[in-house]
């Protein structure tokens, strides 16, 4: 997230440089995903069990991961840093599987997270379950979401575009303040996500006291 030398895949989002350059008054606390050879991150960052043609079956442990975020990680950050711990000032964001988790967190813990950024979220993991959650979740007023995907991502462009559009429509229908973008020339990479930071932080910080 912050520096290339510390990044799981060798390239960060350059968040530290961006926040310094723009003088954005924000505390960012980042966690490292499990980058094991057996794709453990797909387990820890999926709220649902799913099967993938390429990788096989995965028991989703994302609910456990999010429970740790809410009940251990966030309280630790709030206790040790000068945060504003209320939901209006508590954001969550990520890309790919982290984007899926960020969207899930915003829907499942609307009392904790007021705003979220889901870059290239892995909506393919469990679209039916996620759609059901969008329909039934209890949302607090003033919920804000940034969500995007790149026009050059993956192989099934038509399927991705259709799924992304349908999910955005359902989210918007729930009254969420949604900023949705198809990034021209964007792909599934940290370098591409870094370029979206101005749009991400503009959405997250918009009209925030």
For each feature predicted by the language model, list its residue ranges.
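Non-catalytic cap/lid and distal C-terminal segments of serine-dependent acyl enzymes
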Residues: 1-209
């Amino acid at each position: 997230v912050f520096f290339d030398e510390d990044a799981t895949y060798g390239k960060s989002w350059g968040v530290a440089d961006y926040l310094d350059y723009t003088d954005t008054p924000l505390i960012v606390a980042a966690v490292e995903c499990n980058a094991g050879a057996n794709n453990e991150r797909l387990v820890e960052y999926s709220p649902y069990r799913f099967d993938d043609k390429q990788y096989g079956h995965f028991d989703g442990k994302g609910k456990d991961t999010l429970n740790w975020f809410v009940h251990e990680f966030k309280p630790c950050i709030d206790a040790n840093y000068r945060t504003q711990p209320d939901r209006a000032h508590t954001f969550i964001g990520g890309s790919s599987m982290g984007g899926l988790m960020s969207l899930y967190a915003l829907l499942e813990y609307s009392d904790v997270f007021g705003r979220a950024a889901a870059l290239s979220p892995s909506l393919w993991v469990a679209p039916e379950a996620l759609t059901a959650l969008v329909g039934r979740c209890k949302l607090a007023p003033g919920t804000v979401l940034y969500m995007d995907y790149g026009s050059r991502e993956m192989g099934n462009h038509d399927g991705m575009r259709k799924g992304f559009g349908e999910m955005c429509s359902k989210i918007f229908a729930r009254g969420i303040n949604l900023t949705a973008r198809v990034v021209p020339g964007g792909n599934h990479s940290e370098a591409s996500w870094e370029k979206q930071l101005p749009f991400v932080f503009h959405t997250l910080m918009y009209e925030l006291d």
